[in-house]
Swiss-Prot record:
It comes from Sulfurisphaera tokodaii (strain DSM 16993 / JCM 10545 / NBRC 100140 / 7) (Sulfolobus tokodaii). NCBIfam families: PRK01250.1. Homohexamer. GO terms for biological process: phosphate-containing compound metabolic process. Catalyzes the hydrolysis of inorganic pyrophosphate (PPi) forming two phosphate ions. Its cofactor is Mg(2+). This is Inorganic pyrophosphatase.
Length: 172
């Protein structure tokens, strides 16, 4: 993939959208074939509360790129890229290990709606509750799968995680 993490990373990063807001289909980008594929349809009667994707040119310890939930009022097509500002991180584990999610908003030039959101503490509690609820329950009906949320981190923790994931990818 030619898309980089972003020229201003970690302050502004590129996110490749895999799953649009409102979707109950889990899409995943297949790096070898360079296409977005259907991974599965969610077993629960839930939909993704916001757009979901990853930062290209990053690598987590589990071998996957760093996941991002993009807070937005509009669904974005799978396979599109958007420039975002990280505002925090959701710490969680699933059946495969640690699986943190960066929480981000579109950069102001893309969508000024969230220009006043600079850190996770600025995000309304109702939005954080919606995110928590989704990730706590979206795998419940899938055999052998589970999720445990351990808390939130602020913008500085998110940026540190992004820098670590970029360094890990570059040293690979």
């Amino acid at each position: 993939m030619k898309l980089s993490p972003g020229k201003k990373a970690p302050d502004e990063v590129n996110v490749l959208i895999e799953i649009p807001l409102g979707s109950n289909i889990k899409y995943e980008y297949d790096e070898e074939e360079e296409v977005v594929k259907v991974d599965r349809i969610l077993y629960t009667s839930m939909v993704y509360p916001f757009n979901y994707g990853f930062i290209p040119g990053t690598l987590e310890e589990d071998g996957d790129p760093l996941d991002v939930l993009v807070i937005s009022n509009y669904p974005l097509l799978p396979g599109t890229a958007i420039e975002v500002r990280p505002i925090g991180i959701l710490y969680m584990r699933d059946e495969e290990g640690e699986d943190a999610k960066i929480i981000a908003v579109p950069k102001d030039k893309v969508d000024p709606t969230f220009s006043n959101i600079k850190d996770i503490i600025d995000l309304p509690q109702a939005i954080k509750d919606k995110i928590n609820h989704f990730f706590e329950h979206y795998k419940e009906l899938e055999p052998g799968k589970w999720v445990k949320i351990s808390g939130w981190g602020g913008v500085s923790e998110a940026k540190t995680r992004i820098n670590e994931a970029i360094k890990r990818a570059n040293s690979k």
